[in-house]
Amino acid sequence: MRLPLPSDLPATLQPLVTRNQQFISDAVAGHPELDLQAWSPLHRQQFDQVAAASEFVLSLAQREPAMLFALLASGELERRYAPGELRGQIAATAQAAQSEDELARNLRRARNRQQLRIIWRDITRQAELGETCRDLSDLADAAIDEAYQWLYPRHCQQFGTPIGNRSGQPQHMVVLGMGKLGAVELNLSSDIDLIFGFPEGGETEGVKRSLDNQEFFTRLGQRLIKALDPVTVDGFVFRVDMRLRPYGSAGALVLSFNALEQYYQDQGRDWERYAMIKARVVAGDQAAGAQLQEMLRPFVYRRYLDFSAIEALRTMKQLIQQEVRRKGMAENIKLGAGGIREVEFIAQAFQLIHGGRDLSLQQRPLLKVLATLEGQGYLPPAVVAELREGYEFLRYTEHAIQAIADRQTQMLPEGETDQARVAYVLGFADWQSFHDQLMYWRGRIDWHFRQVIADPDDEDGEGELVVGGEWSPLWEQAQDEEAAGRQLQEAGFKQPAEALRRLAGLRSSPQLRSMQRIGRERLDAFIPRLLAQAVEHDNPDLVLERVLPLVEAVARRSAYLVLLTENPGALRRLLTLCAASPWIAEQIALYPLLLDELLNEGRLFSPPLAPELASELRERLTRIPEDDLEQQMEALRHFKLAHSLRVAASEISGNLPLMKVSDYLTWLAEAILDQVLALAWRQTVARHGQPKRSDGSLCDPGFIIIGYGKMGGLELGHGSDLDLVFIHDGDPQAETDGAKPIDSAQFFTRLGQRIIHLLTTQTNSGQLYDVDMRLRPSGASGLLVSSLGAFERYQQNEAWTWEHQALVRARVLVGCKQVGAAFEGVRAKVLGQARDLEKLRGEVSEMRAKMRDNLGTKATAAGTAANAFDAGVPFDIKQDAGGIVDIEFMVQYAALAWSHDHPAILRWTDNIRILEELEQANLMPASDAVLLREVYKAFRSASHRQALQKEAGVIDAAQFADERREVRRIWGELGLS
């Protein structure tokens, strides 16, 4: 937000103008070189404004008028600093010092100069909030680091150079800036929260009496604090607060990296995670500091969803509220209701919960985090806009308060003069107008805070608990079994005894018996909510049957229970999906990270289109270092699991029809294959260099992945494997251009192996896909990757008719466009050749008969016996006569038989559009083509439903009886047997 320029001074402040002008006149009286008459009218006006608002600036101008004149003369009050300019000034000041006393004096004078400049630009609105905070933070960074760089060599001269035991290298200290300093958000009168560390234990060298590294850096840290913190006649540089270090004031001033890691791993508390979010290396050894932060990252950002963070933030807020009440600090704009801290808590709640998986949230500045929360869909744009504007208003107010006397306070002033100063700086004519606006923003912030952080057990307006309380006695066995059974029955359970047995089984399971106290408390809070929502369903028995195994699976990671406790909507969606599909229940039990997807209802039931899918996955992977294969593989699997769930949820809810379900699942696989190929290509090229084509040009990649079967035909279902074929156009004899060259044939074989490895390897998040490569030339005995020429020769000279049938559904998925276009030409040429139709019908019929005999229902002779349509007899939707495969074979027969004269048939690889093409070309009666399309979709829809119920694709033979007879009729009319 931009504040209005300060207008005329209010009446309350007018007397100060005359006083201040007299003060500055008196101050320059003894300095003939300083001429007030040389000031421009603008400078006079600005001085009147700034001095009226800030007693600190006035007193500094009185003590050091030359400092103000120099700033005016240099133009520094009218412009923002160039990058590095402020640091350069502080460095020159520090380096000029000849003693520690002079260092301290120089730094304090430099700080006063910058403070005057920053407040001047802030009050006159020449600097926006971001510039003010950045300049203050840059000032702190420079002061800390330049003081350290001045002190370190002198400390080494006195006590020796610290050497690491392990590396044998000189050691430097690492200074972490926490809180607002770490986030580059310092206010006008901030203290600075620091943590000191050093890489390795060891001793100093180069002096007679060596020091332990710990002692060396402790003494150095003390000298650094002394250079910055004490108040002298020149003021102070920054107040230094070291209480955020391990063990607080009772802990060692400096710790080794190992000790820091051990502490946070074993004893780190929730509030320390919150504090560490903003940690930044502000001084000392930057490279070592980056290593330290990488070591501590797992402590801050958990790799699973961590809704326990909300509990911790809620507890912290309660402690703050108690302190606010105790000290009468309701008017504190930082800690009071709707204050700065609440905005920070909102942002950091999302960071702590989701930051382990969403790397875009691993950043420090609050406004950038808010922008990410909006961009990634965690918070609506309107909410973020209010939080941003309210936060900026509070920060401007904070600066106006602190500018008065350079005091670290966020309390609204009580005196009339200071109130007038704050209102004036914020652009209001009077205190009441300002205060009304302030309370508006505090109200909005507090409302949003309660939406995110509020305790679900808070009472509603009528003083009743929201959900679950009536089920606590049953879960905690505070009532006898008869009463518990009666409560369940009255609530809608058909089998209350079985429900009690299931709950007892959960209660006594090994996983729950070994739970820690906090986990058990979370479970006890969750189960009553689960029961309260289960009885809202038509079949609560089924809900309990499917959800309790999931609860048992995630109970040891009780943060997932917190997620569902904190988010009643997510729990409601979980029960709905599990009631509808045991497949979904099993997926979530196996991969609890999917619970994250239940949080956003709009996102859950609206999967993205193909371009958005590809873009989202690309963006996720770009946030992961290129050499972190484990994280890349996990990210791919998380992506697949999450989007598969979204598709299934959309299908169950009726938001997606069958054809769209297959489209989305196919697009998902294509997006994943595209990134898997890119990863495998980078890894293989890094090892061996790039392969070459026969003309000497480099392949980039000169490789394509062909999808066959359901993948090629855009008909993927839940749990489908991928039928793939790999093709390249490299010169098999030419070598790659890397340090470890191999011939192109070997290169592409290794590339193919790498792709399969990335797709099929089991990790904690499962595998991406099962891959079937048996449709490649010569099947399982053939080369893993074929050259395009070899593929064409095989298809022309050696392939069986069933392989040409499979080629009808073959489609380029990802890879080199040039090779893909060449493949399409080969496919059209092979499939479009003239054929002996009688021979073709015989071969297609023979292959279909073999499949029916081997895979169909034995009891009905694969749907051809007299009992094939009887109720109670099984019908295999896919394999039996009149089913899916019959329709697929008819489509493939038609494509092979007629594409020579009607090449448009080959434009498509999916059965629906090929049938449409056959109808338009009058190769099949319209009524038959329409019937086959509708029956095919009905069969596939039934198969999808069976899959979501974790059942085989077998239904009662009485279903689809008429449709199957019609399919068999058309089969016969095509001359197939």
From Swiss-Prot:
Superkingdom of origin organism: Bacteria
Role, per record: Involved in the regulation of glutamine synthetase GlnA, a key enzyme in the process to assimilate ammonia. When cellular nitrogen levels are high, the C-terminal adenylyl transferase (AT) inactivates GlnA by covalent transfer of an adenylyl group from ATP to specific tyrosine residue of GlnA, thus reducing its activity. Conversely, when nitrogen levels are low, the N-terminal adenylyl removase (AR) activates GlnA by removing the adenylyl group by phosphorolysis, increasing its activity.
Enzyme class label: transferase
Gene Ontology CC annotations of this record: cytosol
Signal peptide from the UniProt entry: none
Annotated organism of origin: Pseudomonas putida (strain ATCC 47054 / DSM 6125 / CFBP 8728 / NCIMB 11950 / KT2440)
Keywords tagged on the record: ATP-binding, Magnesium, Multifunctional enzyme, Nucleotide-binding, Nucleotidyltransferase, Transferase
Keyword Kinase tagged: no
GO molecular function: [glutamate-ammonia-ligase] adenylyltransferase activity; [glutamine synthetase]-adenylyl-L-tyrosine phosphorylase activity; ATP binding; magnesium ion binding
Protein name: Bifunctional glutamine synthetase adenylyltransferase/adenylyl-removing enzyme
Family matches, as CDD domains: NT_GlnE_GlnD_like
Region described as Adenylyl removase: spans on this chain: 1-457
Keyword Nucleotide-binding attributed: yes
Name of the coding gene: glnE
